[in-house]
């Protein structure tokens, strides 16, 4: 095989079946019980002890290796420079489509990593809090593109991550309400020098356009030390979104404060048609144009089947 043929067949990822990946857990202890696992599961997602044991414990072991290597590099560089600097937080990005289960993955990782020995401080934020308020999106004609890159206050998100990496104390992140579908005024989550920060959002692996003047333009993923992309085929994602919409119609949408309260009286047929329209107009377009193209930038890709269970894992080669 010549060099060009080898290059053509090169895969930057090592791909593991579920059973192969599960074997990489080795002796990593299970630190969560069934009750704790159930509280980490998002609406209409699937998560049980076997999923944690076979998928997330090997991830925890891998991350402990990466974090340990980063710490060794930090101390080696500190000796090399002859300076004493505060160790920077290790930042993990979690990306993927709407309805794929990013929140579940992020919460499971937070719970497992926080129980490492010694106990690190592990914080979690979602980029939803950095969406522009609805009033701003409405003025800009962007309500139908909520979740697209242009709907975020990118300078605020980049400033937040820069403050975290520089070791600033008590950095504030805006809070988003899925009930009102808007930023909560004057309420913030405070992140105070965590050892590990998990950042979850649909577009966290997004790249920016190259500037004409040649000046460097930071992107969110520049601050990540490790990234995870949760993947599933589009028809599967569409079905999950419809099922979630129907479940919310029967629960949260009945709250008069809900932005989607008007959908609560819909029949199954009407609600399904509405969910399909929203999916195709907004979420599918965002997936195809902005989210899926970022998948090759992830360190680790979890591929889910129709049953919400991870059936293969791809790890980027070093």
Swiss-Prot record:
Its main location: cytoplasm. It catalyses: (R)-pantothenate + ATP = (R)-4'-phosphopantothenate + ADP + H(+). One of its GO terms (molecular function) is pantothenate kinase activity. CDD domains: PanK (cd02025). One of its GO terms (biological process) is coenzyme A biosynthetic process. One of its GO terms (cellular component) is cytoplasm. ATP binds at residues 96-103. InterPro entries: P-loop_NTPase, PanK, PRK/URK. Belongs to the prokaryotic pantothenate kinase family. Pathway: Cofactor biosynthesis; coenzyme A biosynthesis; CoA from (R)-pantothenate: step 1/5. Keywords: ATP-binding, Coenzyme A biosynthesis, Cytoplasm, Kinase, Nucleotide-binding, Transferase. It is found in: Cytoplasm. This is Pantothenate kinase.
